[in-house]
C-alpha cells in the first residue's frame, strides 16, 4: 500500500529516470522548471537555486535521499544509512541530521531515509546497501509520546511531519525500523539511537500498555544501542567497522553479552577492570518487586552523573552491558559541530511546510545539558548534568549565517539558549578541581553525589555566569541585520534571583511580552517530589519581574507551566493550586497532565507508588482520577468518564474562578427570527452546542421535535426529507412549492432505498459519517462501489 508521506517505490520517480546521459534531474534544475518555484520553506530560495551546486563548503547541500542525489555527489555507495522517524530538515536541532553531517565531515558517506513506509523495506533499498551500518532513530520524540496524549487519546497532528499530519511513523518506531533494516540488509549491523532508544535502554515502565518492558535492544534485536548524545560514539562505531574491529567497549553504548559462571560478561575491555561496576536489578527482579524499578532508575542516574562506572543488568541468562557514558563535548568540538554548513531548510522533496522547521528555523543552540535534575524530566538522563557550551564567536558566526540566509537580509532570532537559557557557561567547581588534578587523557569523573544542582537550593559549587549570557545576547542583537533577540527556551527562576542585574536584562531587553517559567505546582510536598524549589522562590521572582517590567516601561507577563496528576499529588493539592491561581486572577493556559515517560524518577514513583525514600504516596493512576485532577485547573478540558457531555461550572473545584460564557447576540437574533417563522432554534440538535448537557443524539432522528430539512420528494413526512431515501429515477420529479402540496391529491413520486436493506426487517441504512448505521444502531460495512 502507498501513503502520502513517501515517494512511490514501485516505479521510478520522474526525477530519478535517466535523461540521455545528462546530469540527474534530482540534484540539478530540470529544463522548463519555473525559476520561482519554492520548496517547503516559505521565504526560501527557489528549487533551482537550491540545487544548482550539490556541494557547499565541502559538504553536500543536502544529505542524499535518493539514488539521483547520490550520483550528483559522485557517490556510488553509502557508508552509513540513517533511518529517521522525522521529516528531513537540515537543521542542527534535528539529531540524525547533525550526526550525518558530523560523519560526513570525517570522510564517511551518509544518506538519510526519513519517515519510510513500514509495510515493506522498499524505501530503505532506494540508495542500495550501505557499507558499514544502518542507524535507526524514532525522531526527536518518543514515538508513543508523539502519537498519544496524557489520556491515551490519539493525537491529530505531528510537528515533525510535512503539513503537520499524524500517521507518518509507526508506534514504537525503533522496533519497526530495526526490523525493516534487518529485512532489507541481512547481516548488516543495526545501531539504535535517539531519545526513544536512550530512555528505554534497560527495563522500563510503558505507560501506554501499563506494563513493564525489557530493554529495547532485545526487542529490536539490534547489534548496539547508543544512549545519550551520540557524536563521539557513532563516529567511533564507523571507524571501528571500517577497520573491521568489534563494536563492544565504546563509551555511551549498550550491548548484550554472554556471562561466565560468576555472571560476569565475557570479552570485556581490559581497561574496564579498574573501573567501578554497578550491578543493576535484573529484569526478573523488577517484575517481581515494583520498588526495584525505582532503585534501578536511581542507579542509572548516578551512573550518568559519575561518568566513570559501567553497569550490568541480567536479562535471563544474558547480560545487558552499559558502557560508561560518553564524555561531554569540549567547547572546540561543539563549535566544529555547529559550524557545519546546515541549509536550515526542509529538503526540497517536501511540498508542505513542516511545523517544527517553522519553530526552530531562527533558533540558536548555545549549550547542552541541564543541572536542574527535575524528577519528571529526561534531559539530565539523556544529555547529562554537565553543561557543554559553545564559544561566543561560534554563536555570533551562526547568527551572521542566519542573516545571510534570510530573504531580506534581516532576521528576528527566536532563541539563544538550551534546555535552560541562563545555564550557558555554567560549571561545577568540584568537577573543575577534579579535572585539574587528573592525568591528561584520564576518564572524567565527578565527586558530587547530589541528585540536582538546584534542589533543594542552588549548590554553592554550581557557578552560573548569567551576565556573560546577557553580554552574548547583546552582542547578537548588535549584529547588522538582527532585528531582535528573544529567549524562548525559558529561564530558571532560582538562578535568575541570584543575579538581579541579569534578571533586569532578561526582563527589559530579551522578553517578547511573555516569559516562560515552570513553577509546576505550589504544594510544598509535591514540589519536593518534583525536585523543584519552594513557591516562595517563584513568588519572589514574579515580584521582581513585575518591578523590572514597570521600570522598563513594558507590559509583560509570566507564562507559568503547571502540572497535574503528578505522583503524590492529591485532589486537595490541586484545589490549593487552583486557589493560588485564583488569588492572582490567573487563568492557566500551560497545564500539562503528567505523562510517565520511560526512564525518569517520577515514572518509577508512579509505577511503584512510593517516593525516593520508600514512603507510600498517592498516585492518580486511572484515567478518571487523572482527568478529574486536570479539570480542577482546566474545567473545559475533555469529558468526565462517568457521564457524557461537558461538566458544569461547579465541578471546577473549590475556589476556582470561571468566567461566565459570553452571550452570542447574533445567534440569539437568528433564533428569535426562526421562532417567529415557526422554526426551531438553529442550535437544537447540534453536537457542539455547549449549553446542551445531554449526550449528543444522531444528526437524523425521527423522534426529535425540531424541524428537519425540507424535501419535496417524499409524502410520509409532509414534504420533508426522509433520511436514507432518494428519488426513483424511473419517474419524473416535479418540485412542489410548499410542504403540504402532497395533501392536495397529487400523486407524489415513490422512493426507494439508496443503499442495501437489512436482511431481517428490510429497513434501510442511514449514513453517519464514514459508516452505515441501521435504525437499531448496528454498524454495517459500506457497500463497495467501483
Residue ranges, per PLM feature:
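Basic Arg/Gly/Lys-rich low-complexity intrinsically disordered segments
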Residues: 1-44, 636-786
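Terminal amphipathic helices with adjacent charged low-complexity linkers/tails
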Residues: 119, 247-304, 312-317, 325-329, ...
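Conserved SAM/AdoMet-binding glycine-rich loop
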Residues: 75, 80-85, 98, 113, ...
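Flexible glycine/acidic-rich beta-alpha junction loops that bind and position SAM and/or redox cofactors
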Residues: 142-151, 199-201, 231-236, 259-263, ...
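N-terminal [4Fe-4S]-dependent radical SAM core
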Residues: 51-77, 87, 294-363
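Glycine-rich beta-alpha loop elements in corrinoid/cobalamin-binding modules
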Residues: 87, 95, 114-315, 322, ...
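Conserved, mostly hydrophobic/aromatic
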Residues: 223, 337, 395, 517, ...
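N-terminal pre-triad scaffold of radical SAM enzymes
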Residues: 85-88, 351-378, 412-414, 595
Amino acid at each position: 500500500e502507498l501513503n502520502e508521506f513517501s515517494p512511490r517505490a514501485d516505479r521510478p520517480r520522474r526525477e530519478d529516470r535517466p535523461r540521455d546521459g545528462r546530469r540527474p534531474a534530482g540534484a540539478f534544475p530540470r529544463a522548463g522548471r519555473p525559476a520561482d518555484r519554492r520548496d517547503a520553506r516559505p521565504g526560501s530560495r527557489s528549487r533551482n537555486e537550491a540545487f544548482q551546486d550539490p556541494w557547499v563548503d565541502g559538504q553536500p547541500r543536502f544529505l542524499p535521499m535518493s539514488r539521483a542525489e547520490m550520483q550528483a555527489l559522485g557517490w556510488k555507495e553509502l557508508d552509513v544509512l540513517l533511518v529517521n522517524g522525522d521529516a528531513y530538515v537540515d537543521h542542527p536541532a534535528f539529531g540524525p541530521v547533525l550526526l550525518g553531517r558530523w560523519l560526513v565531515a570525517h570522510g564517511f558517506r551518509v544518506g538519510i531515509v526519513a519517515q519510510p513506509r513500514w509495510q515493506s523495506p522498499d524505501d530503505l533499498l532506494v540508495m542500495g546497501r550501505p557499507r558499514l551500518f544502518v542507524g535507526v532513530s524514532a525522531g526527536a520524540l518518543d514515538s508513543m509520546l508523539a502519537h498519544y496524549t496524557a489520556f491515551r487519546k490519539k493525537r491529530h497532528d505531528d510537528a515533525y511531519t510535512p503539513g503537520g499530519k499524524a500517521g507518518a511513523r509507526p508506534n514504537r518506531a525503533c522496533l519497526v525500523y530495526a526490523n525493516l533494516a534487518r529485512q532489507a540488509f541481512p547481516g548488516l549491523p543495526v545501531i539504535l539511537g535517539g531519545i526513544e532508544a536512550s530512555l528505554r535502554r534497560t527495563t522500563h515502565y510503558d505507560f501506554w500498555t501499563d506494563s513493564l518492558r525489557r530493554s529495547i535492544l532485545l526487542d529490536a534485536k539490534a547489534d548496539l544501542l547508543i544512549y545519550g548524545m551520540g557524536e563521539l560514539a557513532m563516529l567511533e562505531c564507523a571507524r571501528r567497522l571500517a577497520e573491521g574491529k568489534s563494536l563492544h567497549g565504546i563509551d555511551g553504548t549498550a550491548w548484550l553479552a554472554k556471562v561466565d559462571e560468576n555472571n560476569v560478561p565475557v570479552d570485556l575491555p581490559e581497561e574496564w577492570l579498574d573501573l567501578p561496576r554497578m550491578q543493576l536489578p535484573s529484569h526478573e527482579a523488577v517484575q517481581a518487586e515494583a520498588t526495584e524499578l525505582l532503585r534501578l532508575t536511581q542507579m542509572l542516574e548516578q551512573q550518568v552523573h559519575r561518568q566513570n562506572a559501567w553497569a550490568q543488568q541480567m536479562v535471563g541468562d544474558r547480560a545487558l552491558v552499559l558502557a560508561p557514558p560518553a564524555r561531554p563535548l569540549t567547547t572546540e568540538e561543539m563549535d566544529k559541530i555547529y559550524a557545519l554548513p546546515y541549509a536550515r531548510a526542509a529538503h526540497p522533496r517536501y511540498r508542505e511546510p513542516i511545523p517544527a522547521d517553522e519553530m526552530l528555523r531562527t533558533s540558536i543552540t548555545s549549550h547542552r545539558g541541564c543541572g536542574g535534575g527535575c524528577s519528571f524530566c529526561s534531559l539530565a538522563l539523556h544529555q547529562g548534568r554537565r553543561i557543554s557550551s559553545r564559544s561566543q564567536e561560534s554563536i555570533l558566526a551562526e547568527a551572521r549565517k542566519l542573516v545571510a540566509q534570510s530573504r531580506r537580509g534581516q532576521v528576528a532570532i527566536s532563541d539563544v539558549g538550551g534546555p535552560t537559557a541562563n545555564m550557558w557557561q555554567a560549571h561545577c567547581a568540584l568537577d573543575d578541581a577534579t579535572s585539574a588534578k587528573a592525568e591528561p587523557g584520564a576518564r572524567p569523573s565527578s565527586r558530587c553525589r547530589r541528585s540536582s544542582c538546584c534542589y533543594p537550593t542552588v549548590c554553592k559549587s554550581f557557578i552560573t555566569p548569567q551576565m556573560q549570557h546577557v553580554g552574548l545576547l547583546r552582542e547578537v542583537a548588535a549584529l547588522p541585520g538582527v532585528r531582535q533577540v528573544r529567549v524562548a527556551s525559558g529561564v530558571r527562576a532560582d538562578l535568575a534571583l541570584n543575579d538581579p542585574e541579569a534578571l533586569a536584562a532578561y526582563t527589559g531587553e530579551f522578553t517578547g511580552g511573555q516569559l516562560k517559567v515552570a513553577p509546576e505546582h505550589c504544594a510544598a510536598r509535591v514540589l519536593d517530589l518534583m525536585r523543584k524549589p519552594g513557591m516562595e522562590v517563584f513568588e519572589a521572582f514574579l515580584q521582581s519581574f513585575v518591578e523590572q517590567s514597570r521600570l522598563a516601561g513594558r507590559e509583560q507577563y509570566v507564562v507559568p507551566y503547571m502540572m497535574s496528576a503528578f505522583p503524590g499529588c492529591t485532589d486537595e493539592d490541586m484545589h490549593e493550586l487552583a486557589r493560588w491561581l485564583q488569588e492572582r486572577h490567573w487563568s492557566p493556559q500551560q497545564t500539562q497532565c503528567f505523562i510517565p515517560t520511560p526512564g525518569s524518577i517520577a515514572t518509577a514513583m508512579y509505577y511503584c507508588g512510593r517516593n525516593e525514600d520508600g514512603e507510600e504516596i498517592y498516585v492518580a493512576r486511572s484515567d478518571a482520577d487523572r482527568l478529574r485532577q486536570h479539570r480542577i485547573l482546566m474545567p473545559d478540558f475533555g469529558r468526565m468518564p462517568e457521564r457524557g457531555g461537558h461538566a458544569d461550572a461547579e465541578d471546577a473545584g473549590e475556589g476556582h474562578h470561571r468566567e461566565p460564557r459570553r452571550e452570542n447576540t447574533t445567534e440569539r437574533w437568528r433564533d428569535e427570527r426562526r421562532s417567529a417563522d415557526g422554526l426551531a432554534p438553529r442550535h437544537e440538535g447540534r453536537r457542539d452546542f455547549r449549553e446542551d448537557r445531554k449526550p449528543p443524539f444522531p444528526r437524523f432522528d425521527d423522534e426529535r421535535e425540531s424541524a428537519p430539512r425540507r424535501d419535496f420528494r417524499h409524502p410520509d413526512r409532509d414534504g420533508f426529507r426522509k433520511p436514507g431515501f432518494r428519488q426513483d429515477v424511473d419517474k419524473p420529479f416535479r418540485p412542489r412549492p410548499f410542504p403540504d402540496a402532497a395533501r392536495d391529491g397529487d400523486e407524489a413520486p415513490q422512493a426507494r432505498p439508496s443503499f442495501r436493506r437489512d436482511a431481517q426487517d428490510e429497513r434501510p441504512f442511514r449514513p453517519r459519517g464514514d459508516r452505515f448505521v441501521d435504525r437499531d444502531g448496528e454498524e454495517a460495512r459500506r457497500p463497495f462501489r467501483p
